[in-house]
Amino acid sequence: MRSPLARPGASPRAPDLRDVEALVRERGLSLGLPLHVEAEAGSTNDLAKSAARDGAPHGSVWLAESQTAGRGRQGRVWSSPRGENLLFSVLLRPGGAMPLARLPELSLVVGLAVRDAAAKAVGDAAGRLRVKWPNDVVALEGDALAGATDGARPRWRKLAGVLLESQITGSGARAKVDALIVGVGLNVHTRSFPGELGSTATSLALLRAAGAPAEELSRAAVLVDVLEGLHRDVAFVAERGLGLVHARLTAADALRGQRVLAEGPTACPTAYPSACPTWEGTCEGIDLEGKLLVRGDDGVLRRVSSGEVHLGSSGSR
């Protein structure tokens, strides 16, 4: 089935994407159909949002081989060579019962689904793939993987990013999520990155064991593994919260135990954000509402709901 927003010049389905529908049906998933594959799109999230307004069903997926206006959190550009990676959006309809407060929790659940699918694809027995609050999947390197205790900051490379956008009905206390657009950018086949990305990004192909044939890395299999994780966890978390997945999320938390630098209004430990653009502390995990727990140098434990959290000027972002 073609999307009504499809570009007329869309190319035939790439070989490693031909099995998506069959795998979705084989596993009995509620997500993945219909699947709309575009040779090029501005943004798959924009396609999904437009289709959602026109009544597209729950579980619909839009995938692009190339994006001209792909974006991540806070408007950052997501760059990807044509046909090498997974750039897709999933439309979720929570059924009118999901409060807005659940959105941060669902962003983490999506990150966990991407992390789990990536770990399966590369055979991540060492547990190097982690979820970095609030919406990235990263691969730990070197001493970070070994759990160095000499005070050195951990080192990681970004593998994937998640962007959630919502369509709301009602207002105030009655506001509910009518449609949730889950956008994912996951590096799969890319082996070299331009500019500064060369030292900050990675891909499934680069993370696999040396000598593993690249052709065995199927984007269809990885995509369906992500969809299966969402199928398993999203409905439960949307209704009841993070309790079911919290232990898994804690085990995969990239920031837990690390010294962090927090920026932004809701990360500020005073009532006057302009007076403290940044502050430092130690991350103690993620709570059941999806907020980052950071104990400041003043000893106070704070719950960070938004803003930027880094490892500091010498660490990975």
What do the PLM-derived regions correspond to, one by one?
Residues 1-123, 142-161, 270-271, 314-317:
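N-terminal lobe of the biotin/lipoate ligase/transferase fold
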Residues 44, 88, 114, 136, ...:
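Residue-level signal for inorganic ion chemistry
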Residues 167-168, 191, 286-292:
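Short, conserved beta-turn/loop elements at beta-strand boundaries and strand-helix junctions
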Residues 141, 163-170:
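Short, low-complexity Ser/Thr-rich regulatory SLiMs
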